Amino acid sequence: LSGLFGVVSKTDCNELLFYGTDYQSHMGTQFGGLAVCADVFKKKIHDISRAQFKSRFYEDYKGLRGTRGIGVISDSDPQPLVVSSRFGTFAIAVAGLITNRDSLAERLSRESGFTFTEIVNDRINQAELVAKLIARGESVVSGIESVFERITGSCSILLLTKDGLYAARDRLGYTPLVIGEKDGTWAVASETCAFHNLGF
């Protein structure tokens, strides 16, 4: 499993992002990560298998300033990733289980000559695979739509650009996303537990 949290605010979002992601901690035990966007993208990823998310990121999150951000707790892949594409730079986090990950990556390598650089335990990072599929689209939205046409299994995506935050889930919603709002600040999460505690 994995847990996602994203936020778009008129002011600095780092504290909301930190606590919102921490409230997803029961969704994964291996990796935690945060990415924010102000003028540039900044990210931090830590192994949380031997320490809680909160203790690993408590000092880091204060330096991640921006009005938009995404966070992830993952059982399988270090995330979020920051990717350069023809749409510009974006950060991406993925939750779910893409059951055709290996065959899809092999097909992309054959068709387009893609090289995958994020390998964990001899498997391609799902976030990198999804990022490459999105980058093949005519736009960010069409790229996200193509992900759901090509994958089997389940997948939810948070994609952060300099312009905003995209949130998407597969048609069946096996890995759901929920949206909350308070005072003009928007959040999206895998589960609502963060919303009650953060006032959404």
Annotate each PLM feature.
Residues 1-200:
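Conserved short alpha-helical segments that host acidic/polar catalytic motifs at enzyme active sites
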